[in-house]
């Protein structure tokens, strides 16, 4: 019998070999791997094979250590002409110290070297090692304020300023151009006092365009001349004064004789001579407040000098200078906990705000890096001054919680200008809330507005956009003090209206909160999106409208017993609640 043999073979062609990367892709992968490998050399956790060390001034801004960065001379010399020239001209080490690593003092190595911190130095060195500029570490370039976007806060500025000093000193032109553009963006966004480090680095590193931009911005700010004189080198301050208008408020000069007496007091404080300050006060009509002596001591003097100064005479520790800062604000900019405690003990308010809405705690947080928080410090170890300042301010705020929410209306002075965006935003938010309350709960709204005396103020009479636009209108017959008083009274009345509404009509207030927080309640949004989205939004709007109706019925029933006991009137149950002999237990839950 013949046996047939059947062979099985695939009719499909063999699978093609995997595609080979193009030569350019291979180069990119290899260079990327090389960059990562070289970057490991700057990692303290990696094998320490450095043959030289760069010594930072004062620990490079890192308390408790990190004052030395190990480097490799061969890499730096190959990548940087600056380091090639430096290492080739450096004398050979002495035989007795041949085994030691040569050290480069950063303060004497480059202009502005004493300002460079470890994080900025490592970032610039990493560019020399890898050819890539890595992003700034968040813990070094972000502040502690959760409400800050960190695009122009002080830690972000300081990191780029320090990096500019390093890049300019090491003659890395492409990095200098990049950092200059970033600093230019900061000038347009940052606070005036935070621009001063940029002004100094622009002068030191010979960046004329950036320097002129900084001078124009600072010259037009409300920073007083004494502050600038203390913070800037003499040549920069002299150049800046040329651009300032002499009769502006920031000049602080009333007359030559007054200016002379004030300067004598400040010179005595510079010499720590509080006794001389006392003599000068007795010999002239100038007071501590006139000379802003508490501000000066809080910003520039030793803590003991301020403590002695506060004993001389009664001074207003909450007085604001021409820039809108209290002595506590100045102390927070300095982050000196002893001075902060001394001022608080004398009655300084932690809730006073600057013209742009910052309080003392916010000032401290926006000056403090995340890495400076130092919350996990070991026992028996000193904590950073920044951490102590924040802790003191937080405890003081907790001690007075009843005035935290109503800070703006609790301020005693009405002379400080209030026409700033955050103030108007708060006022507009309150007006919007009261306007919706009058639409949804007209009777309840009228009652609480009468109690809060809000309906007696002309500004609250209408609900049109024309009335809201009056917020920023200028009445030529109205002085700034009158305008500020009117705005404060308006804010107080609206705040009181909302508080009374929450107390006596909690269900209505709860639904109003829900209504204002729901994006779908915007009538414009009801018609946006797909058909399915519009249907969902309409359903949600109907649900909220039903909640409004139920809440109205519930609060109305709660006050029915009181209403029935009153005589007939246009609004009987409201008038009953105002009479002292009636019970209110059911309405104040």
Curated annotation (Swiss-Prot):
Residues bound to Zn(2+): 143, 148, 150, 153
Stretches with biased composition (Low complexity): 558-571
Cited function: Salicylic acid (SA)-binding substrate-specific adapter of an E3 ubiquitin-protein ligase complex (CUL3-RBX1-BTB) which mediates the ubiquitination and subsequent proteasomal degradation of target proteins. Involved in defense response against the bacterial blight disease caused by Xanthomonas oryzae pv. oryzae (Xoo). Plants expressing an NPR3/NH3 transgene driven by its native promoter show enhanced resistance to the Xoo pathogen, and exhibit elevated sensitivity to benzothiadiazole (BTH) treatment and enhanced induction of defense-related genes upon treatment with BTH.
InterPro entries: Ankyrin_rpt, Ankyrin_rpt-contain_sf, BTB/POZ_dom, NPR, NPR1/NIM1-like_C, NPR_central_dom, SKP1/BTB/POZ_sf
Annotated region (Salicylic acid-binding core (SBC)), positions in chain: 382-521
Presence of keyword Zinc: yes
Zinc finger boundaries on the chain: C2HC NPR-type: 140-154
Complexes and interactors: Interacts with TGA2.1, TGA2.2, TGA2.3, LG2, TGAL1, TGAL4, NRR, RH1, RH2 and RH3.
GO biological process: defense response to bacterium; defense response to fungus; regulation of jasmonic acid mediated signaling pathway; regulation of salicylic acid mediated signaling pathway; systemic acquired resistance, salicylic acid mediated signaling pathway
Sequence ranges of the ANK repeats: 260-290, 292-319, 323-352
Protein name per its UniProtKB record: BTB/POZ domain and ankyrin repeat-containing protein NPR3
Subcellular location: Nucleus
Compositionally biased residues, Pro residues: 13-22
């Amino acid at each position: 019998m013949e046996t047939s043999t059947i062979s099985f073979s695939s009719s499909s062609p063999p699978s093609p070999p995997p595609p080979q990367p193009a030569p350019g892709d291979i180069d990119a992968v290899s260079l990327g791997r090389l960059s990562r490998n070289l970057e490991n050399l700057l990692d303290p956790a990696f094998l320490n094979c450095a043959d030289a060390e760069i010594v930072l001034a004062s620990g490079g801004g890192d308390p408790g250590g990190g004052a030395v960065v190990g480097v490799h001379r061969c890499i730096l010399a190959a990548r940087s002409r600056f380091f090639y020239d430096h290492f080739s001209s450096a004398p050979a080490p002495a035989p007795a110290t041949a085994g030691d690593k040569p050290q480069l003092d950063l303060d004497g190595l480059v202009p502005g070297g004493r300002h460079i911190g470890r994080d900025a130095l490592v970032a610039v060195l990493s560019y020399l090692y890898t050819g890539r500029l890595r992003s700034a570490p968040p813990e070094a370039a972000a502040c502690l304020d959760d409400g800050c976007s960190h695009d122009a806060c002080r830690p972000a500025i300081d990191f780029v300023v320090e990096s500019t000093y390093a890049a300019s000193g090491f003659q890395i032109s492409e990095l200098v151009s990049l950092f200059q553009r970033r600093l230019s963006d900061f000038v347009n966004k940052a606070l005036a006092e935070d621009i001063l480090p940029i002004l100094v680095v622009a002068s030191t590193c010979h960046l004329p365009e950036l320097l002129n931009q900084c001078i124009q911005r600072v010259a037009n700010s409300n920073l007083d001349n004494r502050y600038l004189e203390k913070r800037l080198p003499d040549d920069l301050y002299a150049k800046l004064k040329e651009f300032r208008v002499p009769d502006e408020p920031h000049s602080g000069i009333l007359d030559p004789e007054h200016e002379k007496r004030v300067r004598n007091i400040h010179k005595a404080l510079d010499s720590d001579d509080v006794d001389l300050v006392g003599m000068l006060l007795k010999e002239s009509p100038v007071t501590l407040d006139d000379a802003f002596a508490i501000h000066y001591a809080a910003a520039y003097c030793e803590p003991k000098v301020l403590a002695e100064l506060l004993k001389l005479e009664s001074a207003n520790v909450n007085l604001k200078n021409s820039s809108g800062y209290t002595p506590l604000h100045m102390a927070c900019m300095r982050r000196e906990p002893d001075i902060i405690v001394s001022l608080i003990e004398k009655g300084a308010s932690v809730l006073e705000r600057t013209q742009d809405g910052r309080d003392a705690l916010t000032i401290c947080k926006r000056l403090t890096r995340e890495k400076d928080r130092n919350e996990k410090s070991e026992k028996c170890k000193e904590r950073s001054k920044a951490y102590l300042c924040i802790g003191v301010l937080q405890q003081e705020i907790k001690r007075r919680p009843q005035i935290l929410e109503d800070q703006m209306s609790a301020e005693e002075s009405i002379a400080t200008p209030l026409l700033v965006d955050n103030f108007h935003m708060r006022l507009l938010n309150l007006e919007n809330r009261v306007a919706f309350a009058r639409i949804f709960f007209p009777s309840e709204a009228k009652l609480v507005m009468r109690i809060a005396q809000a309906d007696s103020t002309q500004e609250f009479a209408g609900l049109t956009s024309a009335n809201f636009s009056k917020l920023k209108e200028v009445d030529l017959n109205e002085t700034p003090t009158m305008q500020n008083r009117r705005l404060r009274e308006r804010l107080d009345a609206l705040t009181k209206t909302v508080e009374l509404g929450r107390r006596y009509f909690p269900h209505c207030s709860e639904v109003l909160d829900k209504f204002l927080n729901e994006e779908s309640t915007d009538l414009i949004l009801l018609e946006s999106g797909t058909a399915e989205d519009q249907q969902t939004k309409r359903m949600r709007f109907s649900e909220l409208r039903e909640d409004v109706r139920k809440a109205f019925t519930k609060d109305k029933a709660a006050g029915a017993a009181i209403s029935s006991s009153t005589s007939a009137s246009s609004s009987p149950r409201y008038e009953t609640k105002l009479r002292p002999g009636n019970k209110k237990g059911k309405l104040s839950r």
